[in-house]
Amino acid sequence: MTLNSRILPLAISLMVWLSGAPGFALSALEIMQRVDARDDGDNMTARQEMILIDKNNHRRVREMIIFAKDEGRDTRRLLFFLSPQNVKYTGFLTYDYNSGDKDDDQWLYLPALRKTKRIASSDKSAAFMGSDFSYADMTRRLISEWKFKILKEDEVRSKPVWLIEALPASDIIRKRYGYNKSVIFVRQDLFMVVRAVHWVSAGGKLKYTDMKTIEKIDGIWTATEIDVKTTKARKTLHRTILRFRDVKYNQMINPNLFTVRRLEKGP
């Protein structure tokens, strides 16, 4: 055997190992576990601007304020609409449980009716306040509810990403989230989801999510502009732009803020 015949297979193996290292050093599940474990602070406050754009490019702008706080392994979130007048002081409260044995709790307060509506699990795939986000999108996905597979590597805005397929682990999960499948783009240096495509169960629609702007705030990488659009047959049906400002982490937040009573009281 010649020297070249011994070296060539070794060189090819080394090239394959080096080029494949980012994709094969971790499994899809391990990557998503790191995404889930990424630091997002013990609590957070922010102002939000939600822009709703219909298929005729008509725009509606809504202003909101949001509070979030970890309670052990669970998370609680409270959101109030501040404008326009027709949704002013509408509130949304979520308890995210870090257990597949218990459904997340969600309540929507409608001040015009002076009524609080509890969101049933069967309704969580419905649109949240006319946006491209569903009620299920407003909660945190549990890793145990999905089956993951690495599809390939690519780049988003010149940064290496993994493309990971996420399939619901059961028909119950599929119905709850309203997605047959998702492809998630995870930035390799941050273990942060920066883009996603969702195959909507009803109506043959696709939903595209893009973290347009990412900033480091208080040491935490944060998506400060999120663009979501719903399409069918390659035509955009609706689009939602969500912009964050005045984001603050690890502030003093009263845990009594996250109650139905406080939801009904308003900001």
Please state what every model-predicted region is:
Residues 147-155, 167:
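Active-site cradle of extracellular carbohydrate-active enzymes
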Residues 266-267:
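Short, solvent-exposed mixed-charge patches
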Residues 1-11:
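Bacterial N-terminal signal peptides that target proteins for export
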Residues 21-25:
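Sec/Tat signal peptide C-region and signal peptidase I cleavage site
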Residues 26-112:
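N-terminal mature ectodomain segment of secretory-pathway/periplasmic proteins
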